Regions:
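N-terminal entry segment of metal-dependent catalytic domains or homologous docking segments
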Residues: 1-59, 91-97, 108, 117-126, ...
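C-terminal catalytic subdomain
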Residues: 153-212
C-alpha cells in the first residue's frame, strides 16, 4: 500500500534564534515515514537529526523484505549511526534523538517509536491512537522501543508527529476540520497540527498521510 503524505515543520525559538529541532521524511514512494525530534544541546540538533534520518532512510530504501522487519532494521541502523557519531564528541551530557516511524504493509500499518511521538489513524469518523499514551523522555539511545500495528484500508488518514504537534488546540482544530470534510488534503491537516506550535515558537513536526 501507498499513501499521499505531507510534512509540516515548525521551528523552535531558543535564545532568540529559530532552530530546527524536529524533522521528518517520507520514504519509499509514500509507504513509510520517519519523524525525529532532537534532545540536548541546540548546536547539535542539525547534525544529530541528519545522521539519524540519513541512516534510517538509507536502510529503509535499500533493504527488501517484510515491512515490519525493514522497520526494525532501519531503527537499529539509525541508533547505531547516532551512537557512532556521538562517540566522536566530547560532551558532558550526550544528546539523543526521539524517533517515531511507520511503514505500510499489505493492509497493516506497522509503527514503532523510541521516545516521545504520536501516531493516530482516522477511519470513517473514528480516530484511534496507535502509539501508547505515555510520553517517555529520551530517544533512540535511552528510551525503550515501543511497537504497535493496526489494520489499514484505502482512504484511512494517518496523523503522526512530535508530541508538541498534538496540543489541545491543534487536535481540536484538526478534528473539527476532518468532521466537516473527511477528504481534506493532507497538507492542510499537517499545517493545522503545527500552527499552534509555530505561533508559540516551541517547534513541532507533523505528517498527514492518506492511504490509497
Amino acid at each position: 500500500m501507498r499513501a499521499v503524505a505531507h510534512v509540516s515543520v515548525a521551528r523552535s525559538e531558543i535564545r532568540g534564534r529559530r532552530l530546527g529541532r524536529h524533522a521528518a521524511r517520507v520514504l519509499t514512494g509514500g509507504s513509510a515515514c520517519v519523524i525525529a525530534s532532537a534532545r540536548g544541546w541546540p548546536r547539535l540538533f542539525t547534525p544529530c537529526l541528519d545522521v539519524t534520518l540519513d541512516a534510517f532512510a538509507a536502510h529503509m530504501e535499500q533493504r527488501r523484505g517484510q515491512p515490519q522487519e525493514r522497520l526494525e532494521e532501519a531503527l537499529n541502523a539509525a541508533r547505531d549511526a547516532l551512537a557512532c557519531y556521538l562517540d566522536g564528541l566530547v560532551e558532558r551530557v550526550l544528546p539523543d534523538v526521539a524517533l517515531t516511524a511507520f511503514v505500510l504493509g499489505d493492509e497493516i500499518l506497522h509503527a514503532a517509536r523510541a521516545g516521545g511521538g504520536r501516531i493516530y489513524v482516522h477511519r470513517k469518523g473514528k480516530t484511534t491512537r496507535l502509539t501508547p499514551r505515555s510520553e517517555p523522555g529520551g530517544g533512540l539511545l535511552t528510551a525503550p522501543l515501543e511497537r504497535s500495528e493496526t489494520s489499514l484500508h484505502s482512504g484511512d488518514l494517518i496523523l503522526a508527529g512530535s508530541s508538541s504537534a498534538f496540543s489541545k488546540e491543534a487536535v481540536e482544530r484538526a478534528a473539527a476540520a476532518v468532521g466537516r470534510d473527511a477528504s481534506l488534503p493532507p497538507s492542510v491537516l499537517a499545517n493545522m497540527l503545527t500552527d499552534p506550535a509555530a505561533q508559540a515558537s516551541i517547534g513541532a513536526v507533523a505528517v498527514a498521510a492518506r492511504v490509497r
